[in-house]
């Protein structure tokens, strides 16, 4: 029978519930169990697909096209198991279903309420699609005490009451703030957080305590006493220099074995060789390579979370530290670019939407191309690369993208024109988006084919514009190689400039499929080119 583990948080947000859930999933997986990790978000948006990155950070896209929270990226990167649309839900999606059912008369005229109707939808989500799994780990977004989170806490309380301890475990993550003047960790916020959780009917079985320094036995005993929990189930979560050190830190703290003990499951050895290899590679990484990310949201690193991690994975592969240099694309000009990109070994332009900051991105692409610096353009970054090539290499000075609704030669066009001229609504914005994993055919003897070591691949997408194929011939005459196409050959997936050191643009998002123990081949080749470039300088 499947067992359920609920991960909640208290005191402050952004404590690392997602990393805790992902780490525990990996540790249980290392003991031979099949684990699924899910995220329940209390916000009223149906999904994060139309949210500003400043509000939410990265939108993580699954194989089946779900636009989800960035924590699902942690789940996939730690476990190597692909998430799907059944692994993410929001209050907005719940209310959307509830109100649709109410209008259809599915509630047969009864008064629709938070309890039981909203909580029943939450419970159905948690308890459905569990076949083949030994554990379902559910992360509840937000912190205990948040008004918007109350229906979720009530739903998991009901599940816990029904399944009992044999099949349900509550893990609560809290913060132990360190007060420098007193030179001690403060346990009172944790005590109040647990009190708040118990007030709504949930008693945590395991308490995970975040802290910036080691937690003494006396402090653990104090927490256990006031929170009514055994000391062995108070797990330290000390700050780590790298997130890929977190799973082994939890293993050393005994989190995985405590979970098995709670469920009366025999403790079995863990197969953690690949994670110890990652730790070894991180420790051996002494050399650095400097990568400039030309970003629109340069102050919000979470907007590019998967890109950052994919670069780190390639760094782990080569035992190199990736020194990221964040460049504000809005302030990048021909006059200051030499200074801002001084001693850069590689330039990456990530995905995005909208006209703002595109001039600076194109300036960076020109700089990379004309100075033969390794360049990687992702999604919108590839589209801007084709515009830069059209303007400055081919001579189509008015080359533009149809997205900006300005006059000029449309090098980039809409994929689906069915909604053209219609009012822009959330509904038709979704309809015109190409989302999820699609097959891609590669051309032999190209940079892409050599990187993948295959001519057939699958990659994840999130875009509604594509390269205008009418210009393919003139681009090819000017040295551009189109090395990847959709199966129907309608959409250009990869472009290359083979005469340069490394210049590649991709329409998809390779960062979503990179893992610390299996770096993405394109990121591997990009970092390889950057390393070779820095060694030759």
Swiss-Prot record:
Mg(2+) binds at residues 71, 139. One of its GO terms (biological process) is pyrimidine nucleobase biosynthetic process. One of its GO terms (molecular function) is metal ion binding. Gene3D superfamilies: 3.40.50.880, P-loop containing nucleotide triphosphate hydrolases. Its EC number is 6.3.4.2. CTP binds at residues 13, 146-148, 186-191, 222. One of its GO terms (cellular component) is cytoophidium. The active site is at residues 379, 509, 511. Residues 290-536 form the Glutamine amidotransferase type-1 domain. L-glutamine binds at residues 352, 380-383, 403, 464. Pfam families: CTP_synth_N, GATase. Pathway: Pyrimidine metabolism; CTP biosynthesis via de novo pathway; CTP from UDP: step 2/2. Residues 1-265 are annotated as: Amidoligase domain. Catalyzes the ATP-dependent amination of UTP to CTP with either L-glutamine or ammonia as the source of nitrogen. Regulates intracellular CTP levels through interactions with the four ribonucleotide triphosphates. Homotetramer. Belongs to the CTP synthase family. CTPSs have evolved a hybrid strategy for distinguishing between UTP and CTP. The overlapping regions of the product feedback inhibitory and substrate sites recognize a common feature in both compounds, the triphosphate moiety. To differentiate isosteric substrate and product pyrimidine rings, an additional pocket far from the expected kinase/ligase catalytic site, specifically recognizes the cytosine and ribose portions of the product inhibitor. PANTHER family: CTP SYNTHASE (PTHR11550), CTP SYNTHASE-RELATED (PTHR11550:SF0). This is CTP synthase.
